[in-house]
Every structure is written in structure tokens, then in C-alpha cells.
Swiss-Prot record:
Gene: ydhY
Residues bound to [4Fe-4S] cluster 4: C135, C156, C159, C162
Binding site for [4Fe-4S] cluster 1: C68, C71, C74, C193
Name of the featured protein: Uncharacterized ferredoxin-like protein YdhY
The organism of origin for this protein: Escherichia coli (strain K12)
Entry keywords, A to Z: 4Fe-4S, Iron, Iron-sulfur, Metal-binding, Repeat
Length: 208
């Protein structure tokens, strides 16, 4: 089966492993009031998708759509910190493409989450990473020390196979460097967010 056609939850990290509970993950779970307070949202916000929860090895990235103003500071901070240059297209956190950017540019179609809808998105650090599986030279590997899947820029040939294979198209090839990049869980996006639309909550602070 083409990896893009596989169900998203089959590809992503199982929330069972992260939460150490049985049954469904955060998106379908009745969350304890104390944890909801920590996440800064209500149960109905999670159920409706207004609040997004992206599980990573280091913690949960909480995205609150209603708080996002589309200022792009998260993307700017990400690329400045990781690349030494500023560019929203090759940012590891994705905001711009989720507004009204279609496949062929501005105004050509709805964003991934609907028109006029800012939604932060980034790498899920998949348990079975399709980006890593399809890389023809093995430039994408799991790094135990960093706790994430990374791209070795010395080996990357910029073929974009990783982007095509990812169901969310998260790995992005920088058109200037010709190298692919993806989230390394540095947290700069959340640090730069002026409205609290992005938060990273470490697993040690989450109990269920």
C-alpha cells in the first residue's frame, strides 16, 4: 500500500505508548480536569479539533487554533534558530500552508484545514517513519540522544522522496540549500509564540 494512503493513526506514534494507558489516545479520551487545566483547554475543544495535540517523544505540542493570529513568528524563529536564515516555506512548523494556500499557490485552493483557518502543524515523529523508509541513501535516522528523527544534511541529496512519502508532507526541501529538514523538537516555535497558541508540555508534567 502506498504510505500516503495508509490510515494516519497507523503511521503515527501510538498514543498508548506515550500515555501509558489502554484504549484511545488524547483525541478520543475523556481528559481529567487537572490535565485539561495544564493543556489550557476544555474537553470539547479537543473533541472538535479546535485544540490540536501532537505527540512527540519529548512531550505534547498543544496547538490552539483560536489563539493563532498567523503572525508567522513561530516559522521565523524556527528557521532563524535552525538554519541561520528566515523563510516560512522551509520552516519545520507549518502555518502558512494551512490558511488559503492550495497546491498551486495563494488562492488556488483551500488550506489543509479549510480556508481562513490558521493551524500549526509539524512532524509527528512517527513510530514507523515513512520519510526514513523511502530515503534512498539513508540520510534520515532516529537519534536517541535528541529523541527525534533527523535529516543528515551531509548525506541528503534533496530528492524530496521524504516529503512525498509523509502523509502530512512535513519534511521540506530548502530550495536554496537543496537539503531536506524536519522538526528536531527544539521548542523555538513555542517560545516565540506571542499568544500562547503553541505550547510544549513535557511528559514528566503529564499524569493520567
Amino acid at each position: 500500500m502506498n504510505p500516503v494512503d495508509r490510515p494516519l493513526l497507523d503511521i503515527g506514534l501510538t498514543r498508548l505508548e506515550f500515555l501509558r494507558i489502554s484504549g484511545k489516545g488524547l483525541a478520543g479520551l475523556t481528559i481529567a480536569p487537572a490535565l485539561l487545566s495544564l493543556l489550557g483547554c476544555k474537553q470539547e475543544d479537543i473533541d472538535s479539533g479546535t485544540v490540536g495535540l501532537i505527540n512527540t517523544p519529548k512531550g505534547v505540542l498543544v496547538t490552539q487554533r483560536a489563539r493563532c493570529t498567523g503572525c508567522h513568528r513561530c516559522e521565523i524563529s524556527c528557521t532563524n534558530f535552525n538554519d541561520g536564515s528566515v523563510g516560512t516555506f522551509f520552516s519545520r512548523i507549518k502555518i502558512h500552508r494551512n490558511y488559503f494556500f492550495g497546491d498551486n499557490g495563494v488562492g488556488s485552493g483551500g488550506g489543509l484545514y479549510g480556508d481562513l483557518n490558521y493551524t500549526a502543524d509539524t512532524c509527528r515523529q512517527c513510530k514507523e517513519p515513512q520519510c526514513m523508509n523511502v530515503c534512498p541513501i539513508g540520510a534520515i535516522t532516529w537519534q536517541q540522544k535528541e529523541g527525534c528523527i533527523t535529516v543528515d544534511h551531509k548525506r541528503c541529496i534533496g530528492c524530496s522522496a521524504c516529503t512525498t512519502a509523509c502523509p502530512w508532507m512535513m519534511a521540506t526541501v530548502n530550495t536554496e540549500s537543496k537539503k531536506s529538514s524536519k522538526c528536531v523538537l527544539c521548542g523555538e516555535c513555542a517560545n516565540a509564540c506571542p499568544t500562547g497558541a503553541l505550547k510544549i508540555i513535557e511528559w514528566k508534567d503529564i499524569t493520567v
